[in-house]
């Protein structure tokens, strides 16, 4: 069995780790970074860029650069959160044929699962380069408050990327694993996870290798991206007041503002003031305009205060669900890049009455925990038991549109629960089971996960048939539902697939696309490498020809020039094989030139040596220092 990797698929950054002996190790990517920006872009010529290369060109290519796509995973196009996102991002969010929110570049649409798969592929390649072996299994983390559709979409992303997802694990739980693996003392901890796009809080009991989640709560649309956008809005407003130009209408300017906002936010975690300086941000009839502004930490904290305060209520709910007070929490572990913000740390301290624990790297701890869980599944990590919970209640719609819970939120998973229902009308021969997830009392106010029909119920007065509905949640938090007529034994079951979501054929097509793209990417890479090698040879040959061309016979010189010309021509194409062949031809032809250079060098060295041999050593006499304090030659 090959290595199973742990991946933190983040909104802003992603990270991959693997068990190395008894320890979990974060793997550096090709750029030498321990985290990879969760950004995918398409260049003018259709080349796909992932991570740092995509981030570097975002300012000049905003409409084809996808960031924070995790916030769209498993969401419908008409979701209020998607409406909010559409106004803030420079790329197009479009309605897919199944009603989901997808993204578009150059007329080509991509599902959020597909974009996530491009990032997962990068993580997979990073691990393979480090391990020197193929990797096809992973544990992937998701926000604890992700619903079933979002978890399923994440699993789909893994499949598209060529990974078998052995387990979907909640981010705070993964962080707790990393924090508590070497702790011998039992205790209760809170994991406060404020990342790039989501907020989660989980309460766990840790002891004797058992990690038991008591409760979880959160907000899947609250994170660093919102802090950035709040600052972008402020900068745009201030610039409009000063210059009368609305930068929101200029996608390129907006992307520059976003980059500057993120940089300023990070700087203000370690300094009390920063300067935002964006020359030539736009122009009007009077000429170019520059944006220069000083921003204090106090001003930034005032701008985002309500966002920080929004994290308090989920913490209180999680404590209440766990049956605990803040004083009973032994340690608060901070996870996610946003927890570096002093204001966030201050709010956590006020809420829990203690200094938060800062001994873990907030950007890496989730991936480390995922790798530990991978180690548990592989049998490399012993005596660790992880008991997670379902974040939201699950149930069905019953008479009058009421939401009847079958599995309450914060129930330990995996779990299976049944409840008996009946018909609402006389002689009813079929029932439709509509499955929902959420905490509202009316079904319509919750998230519909799917529906199915149980047919062939024998005629009977209403209330007589016994229909047993069973919910089964696996360790990934993914739901299966069945309905059985107890009188006839007839049963209908479905693995919940959101009313949107990707069908098996969609996933298969995307897997094939990914494989085809992998081959295309390899071909493109080979062409680039061949061109680089050819360019270097052309340059060195031209230089050598200019300096030493007179030392080779005319036919040989002509052969070199012809080979040079052919190679230059081949560089106009992307055919790696042709370029390699022409490179070899030039290398062979220019061997005579190399021989001439070496011959000349050898002759030059011999002449220098001979000249050295002709030097006559001078005689000298040593004079007694006492008499004459010097030497004469």
UniProtKB/Swiss-Prot annotation:
Pfam families: HSP70. Keywords: ATP-binding, Chaperone, Nucleotide-binding, Phosphoprotein, Stress response. The keyword Phosphoprotein applies. Disulfide bonds: none annotated. The modification Phosphothreonine is found at residue 198. It comes from the Bacteria. Induction: By stress conditions e.g. heat shock. GO terms for molecular function: ATP binding; ATP-dependent protein folding chaperone; unfolded protein binding. HAMAP family: DnaK (MF_00332). NCBIfam families: PRK00290.1, PRK05183.1, prok_dnaK. PANTHER family: HEAT SHOCK PROTEIN 70KDA. Belongs to the heat shock protein 70 family. Acts as a chaperone. This is Chaperone protein DnaK. It comes from Rhodopseudomonas palustris (strain HaA2).
């Amino acid at each position: 069995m090959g290595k199973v990797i742990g991946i933190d698929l983040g909104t802003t950054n992603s990270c991959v780790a693997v068990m190395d002996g008894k320890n979990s190790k974060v793997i550096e990517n090709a750029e030498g970074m321990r985290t990879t920006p969760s950004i995918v872009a398409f260049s003018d010529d259709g080349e796909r860029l992932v991570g740092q290369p995509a981030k570097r060109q975002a300012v000049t290519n905003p409409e084809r650069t996808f960031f924070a796509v995790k916030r769209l995973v498993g969401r419908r196009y008409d979701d209020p959160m998607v409406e909010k996102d559409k106004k803030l991002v420079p790329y197009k969010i479009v309605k897919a044929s199944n009603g989901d929110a997808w993204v578009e570049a150059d007329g080509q649409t991509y599902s959020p699962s597909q974009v996530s798969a491009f990032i997962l592929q990068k993580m997979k390649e990073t691990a393979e380069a480090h391990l020197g072996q193929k990797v096809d299994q992973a544990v992937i983390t998701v926000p604890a408050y992700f619903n079933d559709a979002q978890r399923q979409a994440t699993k789909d992303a893994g499949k598209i990327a060529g990974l078998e997802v052995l387990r979907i694990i909640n981010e705070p739980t993964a962080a707790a694993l990393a924090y508590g693996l070497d702790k011998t003392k039992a205790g209760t901890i809170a994991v406060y996870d404020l990342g790039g796009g989501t907020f989660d809080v989980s309460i766990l009991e840790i002891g004797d290798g058992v990690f038991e989640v008591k409760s979880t709560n959160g907000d899947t649309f609250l994170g660093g991206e919102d802090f950035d956008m709040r600052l972008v809005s402020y900068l745009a407003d201030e610039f409009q007041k000063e210059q009368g130009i609305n930068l929101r209408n200029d996608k390129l300017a907006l992307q520059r503002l976003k980059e500057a906002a993120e940089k300023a936010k990070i700087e203000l975690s370690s300094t009390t003031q920063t300067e935002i300086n964006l020359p030539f941000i736009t122009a009007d009839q009077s000429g170019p305009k520059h944006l220069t502004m000083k921003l204090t930490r106090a001003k930034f904290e005032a701008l985002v205060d309500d966002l920080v305060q929004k994290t308090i209520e989920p913490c209180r709910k999680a404590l209440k669900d766990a049956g605990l007070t803040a004083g009973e929490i032994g340690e608060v572990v901070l996870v996610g890049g946003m927890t570096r913000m002093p204001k966030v740390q201050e709010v956590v301290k006020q809420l829990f009455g203690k200094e938060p624990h800062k001994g873990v790297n907030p950007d890496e701890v989730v991936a480390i925990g995922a790798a530990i869980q991978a180690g548990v599944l592989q049998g490399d990590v012993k005596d660790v038991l992880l008991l997670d919970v379902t974040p939201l209640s699950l149930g069905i719609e019953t008479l009058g549109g009421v939401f009847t819970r079958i599995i309450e939120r914060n129930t330990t998973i995996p779990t299976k629960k049944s409840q008996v229902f009946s018909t609402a009308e006389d002689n009813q021969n079929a029932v439709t089971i509509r499955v929902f997830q959420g905490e509202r009392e009316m079904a319509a106010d919750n998230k519909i996960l799917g529906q199915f029909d149980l047919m062939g119920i024998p005629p009977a007065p209403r209330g007589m048939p016994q229909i047993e509905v069973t919910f089964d949640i696996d360790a990934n938090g993914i739901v299966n539902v069945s309905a059985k007529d107890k009188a006839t034994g007839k049963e209908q079951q479905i693995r919940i697939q959101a009313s949107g979501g990707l069908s098996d054929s969609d996933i298969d097509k995307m897997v094939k696309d990914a494989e085809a793209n992998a081959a295309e990417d390899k071909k493109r890479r080979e062409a680039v490498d061949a061109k680089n090698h050819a360019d270097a040879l052309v340059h060195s040959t031209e230089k050598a020809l200019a300096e030493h061309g007179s030392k080779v016979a005319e036919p040989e010189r002509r052969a070199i020039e012809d080979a040079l010309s052919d190679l230059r021509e081949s560089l106009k194409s992307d055919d790696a094989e042709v370029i390699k062949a022409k490179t070899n031809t030039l290398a062979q032809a220019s061997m005579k030139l190399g021989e001439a250079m070496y011959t000349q060098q050898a002759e030059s060295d011999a002449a220098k040596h001979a000249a050295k041999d002709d030097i006559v050593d001078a005689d000298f006499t040593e004079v007694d220092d006492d008499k004459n304090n010097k030497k004469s030659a």
